[in-house]
């Protein structure tokens, strides 16, 4: 019975939605991994007595401090305070793993967790199951926070974007760290889909944030909104394809896959609708920047329809209207498909707000087409090309290269041409691609390209995530036309290093590394002056001894006196995982 209730609750797309949002397409949250009550105080006390030769009852408060967060995490509220509580419990589990892991064994405590998708109970005598489940619940809680945010305010939408991105980060960390989990909802294949789903919903939130102030009937604004909508439709299409893979198709909730398909068609339809509006309502007026408009229109498509050019289309009212009506025709087709897909899923049919949004968008496109419809449209309509997906919410680049501890020079633009099909340089590496060797007489070298440069864009096309073959294909596609390639290069690390005395002399705030250096110096001095008394195994981390011991393994000596008072163990935040963090 509990299994069926968990499955029905956690796979519902209607749960955790903000009831005050009257006209918002629902999002997909994750349910928490439920558990059972566990009392491991007796087991830990026995272990302390057996291994450390100390009375376990002296540490009742500390053991209670470990058990209380676990109980509180079972029913967390949807706010940042509960996320902090989950992370506190996760970190305490890391310390417990170090304290009580003996060789290849640990205290025999059974941990129980239910699969969040199908409700199957998993039980193991392994603390790593508990740690992995806490991480999963942290990511799930972030999804519920993102779903619950107020979408009628910019701050609420930004909070939703942040929450979904944090959820994706936590789940991706879980996938890379805990590689052999017994629960299917934490398998690498399922976590990959969940990460993609969170990033997709973050992208949807970006579109809603752009649209919230209102969409002006202005050329450049409509181009931006159309491409953002196309981006959302594209990522939802990719998500639906990922959900249809053999490894996850049988276990992914049908309502999730259906909603991904519905949104893929819905946002693709919006992209065609906004493109149609910018074409039909556009008027060439004196003083307009036609060059900029021509460039934007050319970048809106992979290719223009046969017989049309961007500039001629902008100047010709008839061509613009015909192309705009073609986009409306495609928009209505996608709207019809989104409504049909939503009607096939029982859970989606029951979500009234979703049906209203889909029908309203479909009716708007139909009315717009009816206003400009002519008798011979079916004979004269051309096939409207797909809108190129583009967004302002692009990732910075691969983390292996673009990270804060590397110093970068400002981006440089190099303009050059390929002479007789020869670029004059070679490429290497994965994403991002690096310029390796340049011919001494090639035009790229004359334009300013250097060996070791990383290619970030070519003709405004983002290349930070492209492979060598993809970048080479893009470069050769321009033939002998001029190519604008933007590159960045690493700053010489030796030129930006500052010694310790120079930093202190100007009164700068001490960094973490400097504090560690200072502590190390103090420790060396203390060792020559006196020998500190050995500490009991649970006394690490107290304010009195925080700088005297940098280890969590301060075990009692054989001759150490038994402590007479109970010692309070604080909640340290420096240990995220142990070396044995994978199954």
UniProtKB/Swiss-Prot annotation:
Residue ranges of domain PDZ in the record: 412-490
TM region positions: none
Source superkingdom: Eukaryota
Gene3D superfamilies the UniProt entry points to: 2.30.42.10, alix/aip1 like domains
Pfam families for the chain: BRO1
Limits of the BRO1 domain: 26-375
InterPro entries in alphabetical order: BRO1_dom, BRO1_sf, PDZ, PDZ_sf, RHPN1_2
A biological process from GO: negative regulation of stress fiber assembly
Name of the molecule in the record: Putative rhophilin-2-like protein RHPN2P1
Gene (UniProt): RHPN2P1
């Amino acid at each position: 019975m509990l299994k069926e209730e968990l499955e029905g609750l956690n796979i519902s797309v209607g749960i955790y939605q903000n009831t005050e949002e009257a006209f918002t397409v629902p999002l997909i949250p994750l349910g928490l991994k439920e558990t059972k009550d566990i009392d491991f105080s007796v087991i830990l006390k026995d272990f302390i007595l057996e291994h450390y030769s100390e009375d376990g009852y002296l540490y009742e408060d500390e053991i209670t401090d470990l058990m209380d967060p676990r109980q509180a995490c079972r029913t967390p509220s949807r706010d940042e305070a509960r996320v902090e509580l989950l992370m506190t419990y996760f970190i305490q589990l890391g310390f417990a793993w170090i304290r009580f892991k003996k060789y290849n064994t640990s205290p025999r405590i059974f941990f129980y967790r239910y699969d969040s998708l199908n409700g199957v109970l998993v039980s193991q005598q392994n603390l790593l199951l508990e740690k992995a489940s806490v991480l999963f619940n942290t990511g799930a809680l972030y999804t519920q926070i993102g779903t619950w945010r107020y979408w009628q305010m910019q701050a609420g939408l930004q909070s939703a974007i942040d929450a979904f991105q944090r959820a994706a980060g936590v789940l991706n960390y879980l996938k890379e760290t805990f590689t052999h989990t017994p629960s299917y909802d934490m398998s690498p294949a399922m976590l990959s889909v969940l990460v993609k789903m969170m990033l997709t919903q973050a992208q949807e939130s970006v579109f809603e944030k752009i649209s919230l102030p209102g969409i002006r009937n202005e050329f450049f604004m409509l181009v931006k909104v159309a491409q953002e909508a196309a981006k959302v439709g594209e990522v939802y299409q990719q998500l639906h394809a990922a959900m249809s893979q053999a490894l996850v198709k049988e276990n992914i909730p049908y309502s999730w896959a259906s909603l991904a398909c519905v949104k893929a068609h819905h946002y693709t339809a919006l992209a065609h609708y906004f493109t149609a509006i910018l074409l039909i309502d556009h008027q060439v007026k004196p003083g307009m920047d036609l060059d900029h408009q021509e460039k934007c229109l050319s970048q809106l498509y992979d290719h223009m329809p046969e017989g049309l050019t961007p500039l001629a289309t902008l100047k010709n009212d008839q061509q613009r209207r015909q192309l705009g009506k073609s986009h409306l025709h495609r928009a209505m087709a996608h709207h019809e498909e989104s409504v049909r897909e939503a009607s096939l899923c029982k859970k989606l049919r029951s979500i009234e707000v979703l049906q209203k949004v889909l029908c309203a968008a479909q009716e708007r496109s139909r009315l717009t087409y009816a206003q400009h419809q002519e008798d011979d449209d079916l004979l004269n309509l051309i096939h409207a090309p797909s809108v190129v997906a583009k967004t302002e919410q692009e990732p910075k680049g691969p983390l292996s290269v673009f990270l804060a501890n590397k110093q970068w020079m400002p981006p440089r633009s190099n303009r050059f041409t390929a002479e007789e099909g020869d670029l004059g340089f070679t490429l290497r590496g994965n994403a991002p691609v690096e310029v390796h060797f340049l011919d001494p007489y090639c035009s790229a070298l004359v334009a300013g390209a250097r060996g070791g440069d990383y290619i970030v864009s070519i003709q405004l096309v983002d290349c930070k995530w492209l492979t060598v073959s993809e970048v080479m294909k893009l470069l050769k596609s321009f033939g002998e036309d001029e190519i604008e390639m933007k590159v960045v290069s690493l700053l010489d690390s030796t030129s930006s290093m500052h010694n310790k005395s120079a930093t202190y002399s100007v009164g700068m705030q001490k960094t973490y590394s400097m504090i560690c250096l200072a502590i190390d110096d103090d420790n060396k001095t203390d060792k020559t002056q006196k020998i500190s008394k050995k500490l009991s195994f649970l006394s690490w981390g107290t304010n009195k001894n925080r700088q005297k011991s940098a280890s969590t393994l301060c075990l009692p000596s054989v001759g150490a006196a038994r402590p007479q008072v109970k010692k309070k163990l604080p909640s340290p935040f420096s240990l995220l995982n142990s070396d044995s963090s994978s199954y």
